[in-house]
């Protein structure tokens, strides 16, 4: 049985699983779908064409599915899609997409979104991501699986943050952070490989060693980016556990539009 507080407003048309819990004074819009066992905190607003999966916990005063902060937006029925088992803490804001991009903002599974985080229009957040309190994502930002974004950080529009990367607190990021790399500062600069995070996630010693070698080629040996990429491709043919992550690193760099931090 759905547990909806008598002061909450669920507009006609909303599709709410019978196991969902909705707290006092929450507002659920007519185009919202909420999956099983999700809880919505008091005073939260879930609006727009928003789909929320199962087992999510949304804290009080969150604003989910709001209009994009984009002056080109003209009330198009763009979307927000949220996966399963996410924690979205109080006062977080997540906006729908725009037609200038794919028209959808996405948040995957098992993410930990702390208080006052902003996820702008057309962002694509993967799985197992941690966004610390007051981290601010501008529009069109992409964040790979297992990335960690420190509190009070700002990420420029269209920036990409690779899988297993880490951005330190109070950083200003204006270019892409390659996978596995730690970045910090204003403006953010590279500070090594996220070794501890990789160990916790089961990366082998050989894979971590290969990524450390890749980091030296990219940042420590005085090579141009093209020279470094050539040597990285050679490193990725070594035949060990490091081949796949080094290849992922090269593919990320090749796809960069804003350039990587250097």
Swiss-Prot record:
Keyword Lipoprotein: no
HAMAP family: LpxA
Main location group: cytoplasm
Highest rank taxon of the organism: Bacteria
Pathway as given in its UniProt record: Glycolipid biosynthesis; lipid IV(A) biosynthesis; lipid IV(A) from (3R)-3-hydroxytetradecanoyl-[acyl-carrier-protein] and UDP-N-acetyl-alpha-D-glucosamine: step 1/6
Functional summary from the UniProt entry: Involved in the biosynthesis of lipid A, a phosphorylated glycolipid that anchors the lipopolysaccharide to the outer membrane of the cell.
Xref: Gene3D superfamilies: Hexapeptide repeat proteins, Udp N-acetylglucosamine O-acyltransferase, C-terminal domain
Keywords: Acyltransferase, Cytoplasm, Lipid A biosynthesis, Lipid biosynthesis, Lipid metabolism, Repeat, Transferase
Self-association and partners: Homotrimer.
Family: Belongs to the transferase hexapeptide repeat family. LpxA subfamily.
Catalytic activities: a (3R)-hydroxyacyl-[ACP] + UDP-N-acetyl-alpha-D-glucosamine = a UDP-3-O-[(3R)-3-hydroxyacyl]-N-acetyl-alpha-D-glucosamine + holo-[ACP]
GO molecular function: acyl-[acyl-carrier-protein]-UDP-N-acetylglucosamine O-acyltransferase activity
Gene Ontology terms: biological process: lipid A biosynthetic process
Localization annotation: Cytoplasm
InterPro entries the UniProt entry points to: Acetyltransf_C (IPR029098), Acetyltransf_C_sf (IPR037157), Hexapep (IPR001451), Hexapep_transf_CS (IPR018357), Lipid_A_LpxA (IPR010137), Trimer_LpxA-like_sf (IPR011004)
Protein name (record): Acyl-[acyl-carrier-protein]--UDP-N-acetylglucosamine O-acyltransferase
Enzyme type, top EC level: transferase
EC number(s) on file: 2.3.1.129
